[in-house]
């Protein structure tokens, strides 16, 4: 079990304690994400593809940096580019996860919501443990067992916080994204520790 309020408090405290690295890495990720949509014309399309590839590398490194901070390590900003060996596995799970959720949404919506929540930690698990795609999804399913409603509420809170950050001229995302990332890792660690003996 975990506390949503405690996870948000933890996220806020960790963001403040590591503000420089948190904001700088978030700014990079958002900036690359903003230009990864491609555009009209061959050059813009190629640029968009390259930016999308770079974004995946950055997203992997971003998660790794925040995991290391949570584990009392001292990562550097340049470390955001050093987790590229996970690129193909992360790309695979980034495709498989939304496909599963989409199929679930087609099945009267409720299965999609269930699967979205139960598999929500799979990308983070992959980055944290270097497990395979299927193993990461199985692990996410296992650690979230018995916590569906609490996790659904948690992800709603995460969405609201980031939406409010977006409304603040987008600048608020430089705060809300690190806070919710640390909060997500807090919940992930709590669920991993409390996995044994839980039933849905």
Model segments located where?
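Selective recognition of hydrophobic, aromatic-rich stretches within alpha-helical transmembrane segments
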Residues: 41-71, 98-138, 162-197
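Interfacial aromatic "cap" segments that immediately flank transmembrane helices
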Residues: 2-32, 74-103, 115-166, 197-200
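Juxtamembrane "helix-exit" motif on the non-cytosolic side of transmembrane helices
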Residues: 35-40
């Amino acid at each position: 079990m975990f506390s949503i309020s405690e996870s948000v408090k933890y996220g806020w405290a960790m963001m403040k304690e590591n503000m420089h690295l948190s904001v700088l890495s978030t700014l990079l990720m958002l900036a690359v994400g903003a230009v990864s949509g491609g555009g009209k014309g061959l050059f813009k399309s190629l640029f968009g593809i390259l930016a999308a590839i770079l974004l995946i590398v950055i997203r992997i490194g971003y998660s790794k940096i925040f995991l290391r901070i949570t584990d009392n390590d001292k990562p550097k900003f340049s470390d955001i580019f050093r987790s590229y060996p996970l690129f193909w596995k992360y790309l695979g799970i980034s495709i498989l996860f939304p496909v599963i959720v989409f199929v679930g949404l087609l099945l009267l919506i409720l299965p999609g919501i269930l699967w979205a929540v139960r598999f929500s930690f799979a990308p983070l698990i992959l980055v944290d443990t270097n497990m395979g795609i299927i193993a990461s999804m199985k692990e996410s399913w296992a650690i979230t067992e018995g916590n569906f409603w609490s996790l659904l509420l948690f992800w709603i809170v995460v969405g609201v916080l980031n939406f409010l950050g977006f409304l603040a001229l987008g600048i608020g995302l430089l705060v809300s994204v690190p806070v919710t990332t640390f909060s997500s890792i807090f919940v992930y660690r709590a669920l991993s520790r409390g996995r044994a003996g839980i039933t849905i």
